[in-house]
């Protein structure tokens, strides 16, 4: 009898523990999850109105960015017969970017009833950037949307669809075409296929910057190019968004040496395309494309600071100390912090 009583006592204790654990789990607050912002980019010195999408974003009152020069205030609904005072529209904010904010990809989080949300990327474009939204039906080469060199198109790929664009390039012009998707946390695994005016494929690319494609176009004569943008598995939807850059501006491929001692001031060789004052004298090629080079004196800071830009890469890369460097109108590259003198 004693053993039966002991067995019943143990069962009751276990049941009480399970019930108390269930009550603790149920008492946990939901996590604020910011899934999407539209639009997710703005030029320096501009103000845009954006909307936020996600879950558990009740009473969203504030947006916080990883750069102090990017600020936001909620869009207010006007007073009416029912609400005598202006009230906050939870999902819409007016975002202002200061003129001195460097171009890059930054983090944004929402402050809501359930606390600080998860982060999403927000792109700051150069002040003189020509920003274009995809418009109309452009799902075939015949209906391709016309754009100009030195433009950035923001769009999204539909499921089982292709977005087509066309642009005119001058003879000898070195045009760089880049798709930014993974780097802004898009689900798009993109590819770019280039055709000439006769419909012949010239080149294609994917997986240059992680999963994001990048390619170079150069012709001796004036040429019209057609770009076909799609997911490699033809997936699509609102979460398969992208930024398409078509540019003849400077682009840095890499810097040598790739690291320097903190606080040092040394001469580095910058390799890339369309570099100001660049030459092909070093005869360096990357995937069959000749790279220009210039010598630049760079001052590294004494103390490493966390990168201001959004980091979509592997977690271990986020702890690498370094300094973000860029030329005027170029992309940003990281120069690492060396723990010993660098010998060239």
Region spans (language model):
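N-terminal secretory signal peptides that target proteins for export/translocation
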Residues: 1-7
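Bacterial N-terminal signal peptides
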Residues: 11-23
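Acidic, Ser/Thr/Pro-rich low-complexity intrinsically disordered segments
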Residues: 28-81, 90, 103, 113, ...
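Periplasmic N-terminal soluble interaction domains immediately after the signal peptide in Gram-negative
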Residues: 86-114, 122, 229
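Surface-exposed, short loops/turns at beta-strand junctions within beta-sandwich domains
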Residues: 99-102, 220-221, 314-319
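Extracellular and select intracellular beta-sandwich modules with Ser/Thr-enriched
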Residues: 104, 116-120, 238-240, 328-333
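Contiguous beta-strand segments of beta-sheet-rich domains
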Residues: 105-111, 308, 320-326
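Predominantly extracellular/luminal regions of secreted and cell-surface proteins
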Residues: 120-149, 328-344
């Amino acid at each position: 009898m004693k053993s039966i009583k002991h067995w019943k006592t143990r069962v009751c204790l276990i049941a009480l523990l399970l019930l108390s654990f269930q009550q603790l789990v149920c008492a946990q607050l939901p996590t604020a999850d910011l899934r999407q912002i539209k639009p997710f980019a703005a030029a320096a010195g501009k103000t845009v109105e954006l909307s936020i999408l996600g879950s558990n974003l009740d009473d969203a009152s504030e947006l916080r960015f990883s750069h102090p020069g990017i600020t936001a205030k909620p869009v207010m609904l006007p007073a009416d017969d029912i609400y005598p005072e202006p009230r906050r529209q939870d999902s819409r904010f007016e975002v202002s970017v200061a003129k001195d904010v460097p171009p890059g990809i930054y983090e944004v989080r929402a402050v809501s009833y359930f606390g600080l949300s998860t982060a999403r990327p927000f792109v700051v474009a150069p002040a003189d950037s020509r920003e274009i939204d995809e418009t109309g039906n452009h799902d075939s080469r015949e209906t391709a949307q016309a754009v100009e060199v030195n433009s950035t198109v923001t769009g999204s790929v539909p499921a089982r669809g292709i977005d087509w664009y066309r642009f005119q390039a001058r003879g000898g012009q070195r045009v760089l075409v880049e798709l930014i998707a993974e780097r802004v946390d898009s689900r798009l695994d993109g590819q770019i296929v280039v055709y000439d005016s006769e419909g012949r494929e010239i080149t294609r690319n994917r997986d240059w910057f992680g999963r994001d494609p990048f390619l170079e176009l150069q012709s001796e004569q004036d040429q019209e190019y057609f770009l076909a943008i799609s997911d490699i598995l033809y997936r699509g939807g609102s979460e398969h968004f992208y930024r398409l850059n078509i540019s003849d501006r400077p682009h840095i491929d890499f810097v040598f040496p790739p690291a320097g001692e903190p606080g040092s001031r040394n001469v580095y060789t910058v390799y890339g395309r369309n570099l100001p004052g660049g030459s092909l004298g070093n005869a360096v090629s990357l995937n069959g494309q000749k790279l220009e080079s210039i010598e630049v004196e760079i001052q590294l800071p004494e103390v490493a600071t966390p990168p201001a830009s959004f980091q979509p890469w592997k977690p271990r890369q986020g702890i690498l100390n370094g300094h973000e460097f860029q030329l005027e109108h170029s992309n940003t590259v990281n120069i690492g912090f060396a723990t010993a003198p660098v010998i060239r």
